[in-house]
């Protein structure tokens, strides 16, 4: 006989019995002062060790600041005319079964032609194109849910669901430690 590979649940949205209630991202981060990745002055709080974030360049800040909770910047809509029916980004399996990001996601508003606040890069000829990326890249966390798993790349806005739920930045190291519950213990680094 083999053991179970999936551990028994310990938490739930609506706990019963011995289960504990989920801890949301907002609850975990409630005691941290706000930061902003727009400039150096607002990107750290000297009172809390490791509570600092990388500064985003102007384009990345534009993408992040227009990304709603639970959504990816690849789905951002037009900030000029307010048109909100531009196609959103998707992942598709190719004929070999490999998951590939869509090549049809528009970079310009279908109504007014303005560039959308979506991750893009400049080609050698000076034209812009949408960056390659999956639907979890440049994605803002949802404040009312538990945090998604954090990877070693959590300090990059393009990393999987690592944009702060309501501030224009990624998580600080201090916040990542809190989400992983490491800040609940005394460590000497």
For each predicted feature, which ranges?
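Flexible, glycine-/basic-rich loop-and-beta segments that form/coincide
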Residues: 1-42
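C-terminal target-recognition/interaction regions appended to catalytic cores
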Residues: 43-189
């Amino acid at each position: 006989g083999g053991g179970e590979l999936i551990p028994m649940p310990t938490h739930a949205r609506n706990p019963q019995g011995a289960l504990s209630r989920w801890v949301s991202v907002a609850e975990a981060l409630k005691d941290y002062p706000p930061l902003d990745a727009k400039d150096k002055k607002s990107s750290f709080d000297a009172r809390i060790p490791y509570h600092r974030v990388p500064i985003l360049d102007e384009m990345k800040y534009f993408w992040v600041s227009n990304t709603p909770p639970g959504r990816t910047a690849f789905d951002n809509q037009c900030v000029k005319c307010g048109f909100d029916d531009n196609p959103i980004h998707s992942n598709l399996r190719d004929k070999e079964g490999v998951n590939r990001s869509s090549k049809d996601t528009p970079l310009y508003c279908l109504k007014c032609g303005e560039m959308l606040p979506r991750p893009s890069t400049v080609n050698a000829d000076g034209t812009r194109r949408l960056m390659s990326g999956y639907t979890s890249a440049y994605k803002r966390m949802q404040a009312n849910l538990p945090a998604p798993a954090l990877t070693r790349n959590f300090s990059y806005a393009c990393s999987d669901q690592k944009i702060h739920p309501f501030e224009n930045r990624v998580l600080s190291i201090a916040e990542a430690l809190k989400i992983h519950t490491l800040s609940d213990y005394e460590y000497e680094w």
